Amino acid sequence: MRIAIQGELGSFSHQATLQIEPEAILIPCALSPEVFRSVLSGEADAAVIPIENSLAGSVVEHFDLLFQSDVRIEREFSLRIRHNLIAAPGSKLEDIRQVLSHPVALAQCRRFFAAHPAMTPSPFYDTAGAVKHTIELGDRAVAAIAGEQAARAYNGLVLQAGIEDNPANFTRFFLLRRSAQVHQQPDADKVSIAFSVKNRPGTLVAALQVFADHHTNLCKIESRPVHGQPWEYIFYVDFQVADPAVPSAVLQQLKRQCLLVKELGYYPAARLLS
């Protein structure tokens, strides 16, 4: 299966993809919109995108692209994020002076930098890209922070593993397909939707009451601005159900009282990947 991912080979998206589809042919894309275009054009059969980190929060651009694109979520899964200090072969920990990585990864390793004041963190566009650049540079005073997949992809040396501040660091990923090609999972128990309501008192409360009336487990709600309409919002909701008849009942009732409703996916709730 051809799967599009955002970023360089060796990224956490790469690592997550191989854990669920070990034989996948990866299509790395520089930007997130390219990932979605790759799926919609048929260049890729599916895409794997990060949607939320347990520490840094949501990847808001991906919520917008989900809403705008004719794709649906087929699966979700979570990956434990382990950050590693990676350098060119022959490098030594005590010689490192500059450390490259994505700003989120750098922020999640503050204790490591506090313990190594001689190292200067430097933002880079991508964790795996930082490793690729470091290995190509060949400067033994430069290192990068990324997952172990990046070290394997670019023959980097792991100088220190597990340098993240918080071991309870997980990222949720979605496996997406074109809407017409999604395979419905028999054990689906989680639904993602987007909806908007009129900007007047009580409309959002009334919409949320629908979930309570059907005894769903509302596990996430997030708002995003409507592009071109200041102070208007789209609400993204994840909810879990025990009865397979509930999702359609919820959607039907929401459609009667909301301006718009879009189902983003009906899939099995995630299991944690180590």
Across the structure, where does each feature detected by a protein language model lie?
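Domain-level signature for soluble enzymes in the chorismate/prephenate branch of the shikimate pathway
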Residues: 1-274
